Amino acid sequence: MELISSSTIGNSALCLTLISILIFFFLTTTTIPTFPDHPLRSLLDDSQITTNSSSIVNPKSSCVSSRSHDNGGVINYFSLHYCIFNENLFFSIPILSLLILLHFYILIKTAQTHFSTVTTKLADRLNLSPSMAAVTLLALGNGAPDVFASVAALRGGQYRTGFGAILSAGTFVSAFVVGFVAIYAAPFPVDAASFVRDVLFYLIAALFLFYVYLSGEIFVWQAIGFVGFYIFFVGFVFWMDFGTNVEKGKSISEEEKDLLRLQDCEIAAGSLGSYKAEKEHQFSGIFRLYGTISRMWETPVSVLLNLTIPKPSPSEWSRFYRSANIVFCPFALLYTCNSFVQLNHPISFLFPNTHLPLWLVVLFMTSSLAFLHFTVEKQPPKTEQLPVIVVAFIMSVFWISTIAGELLNCLAALGTLLKLPPALLGLTVLAWGNSVGDLVADVAVAKAGRPAMAMAGCFAGPMFNMLVGLGSALVMQTANVYPDAYKLGFHVGIVIAFVFLLLSLMGSLLVITWSRFRVPRFWGICLVGLYVAFTFVSLIIASVST
């Protein structure tokens, strides 16, 4: 029992501290600009299609109105078309297409060279098993956009949108992302107890939510039960893994650690390029074109990411980049919390009667610290530092979430310019937007040699969104009407989403169990086909209802 003494308590305390920081990082804002608040992200609420589509994807065809059309992101893509290119589709379509490729490149680059690396290092430093890392690190990292979207939707009175967003994202991850991971990495084994536990807990949570939705009302104790159920799930995961660690005497074998270190080195050396080289013979034309384009922005993107995401490894340490991290990392976090604390918020600094904007004060303080670091620190640290790994993890999540939001806005603008139907946009572009980060991150983790962690994250992440994200939002709403119940309306689209979500979960449980807990590639193809069927059925329902 010595293993569950001081080291276990210390690691648990560090993990709880990290969770608290990330929850504050994601949930203290009400309108985070990097997570676009699109009511049609799931488009299971067809009433929103006709009433709100104009405010989302149909700005007036003028430069002035397009500038006033706030898409909640960094770049206003409609202004590019109406103001810069003077409504010339010959220029707008290629530029927006290139921007979409750029967004995908940054997503893949961030996930493979930073997120998967620091997640592996952080799990290793905290002695977390793949399951423990999945229910904490991957769930928090992948689920942040959907948690925010759910809270914002229900606080705005759009309960149907909140349910639809969670269910469509859950179906996307449990069907399409799991299928993609299976197609890429299969066949690979999964731990029988952990897999059955994760899927069963997710099934129970989905069935409980389905029951509550069909009842048409929810009480505050039921909403609290959602959040409490996930806390119980995390505790159960830790209890199971701690018991396994005591029996084995260690959480991760030395061989696995050596493999992870080797994979980290391979990723840092540029696994994205090697992956493209492996697949180039299959799709030579596409990859040759994409490779030519990506080489043009490889250096600028790498420099930008290195300026904002610290490198934990001493062998990759750079005095210039580490000093730049001290300046830019606080600014990125400050930008994320812009709605909570305005960048131009006046504060007294140095002199009582002098009011300076917050961003200027932060710039002065971080620049001073960066200059001090640059002049004092001459040698890299001898070992990897846990605070640096934590900051790198948070900044990787920041970039994945930010670029996923920009990709969503750019795709929505391109679809509007191509005059695609709003229902089709909602069921494809807007439904996939915030889940692109899940796809890229989980596939990157699988590519880093940990498909079991990626598989666990595919179930723990959506369950975190459902129980913590939607549960927290429902707690707020039910508390406002306590002791009465919060009323829920019926919509056939949400029932269809429940059905496909339950089909994907029960199918994975049966097929993988039948395959002796090895994930077969054919099941990945079936899951992708299941999601395609869900998209078509939902599109038909949305069109008929409209």
From Swiss-Prot:
It is found in: Cell membrane. One of its GO terms (molecular function) is potassium ion transmembrane transporter activity. InterPro entries: CaCA_antiporter, NaCa_Exmemb, NCX_ion-bd_dom_sf. GO terms for biological process: potassium ion transmembrane transport; sodium ion transport. GO terms for cellular component: nuclear periphery; plasma membrane. Belongs to the Ca(2+):cation antiporter (CaCA) (TC 2.A.19) family. Cation/calcium exchanger (CCX) subfamily. This is Cation/calcium exchanger 5. It comes from Arabidopsis thaliana. The gene is CCX5.
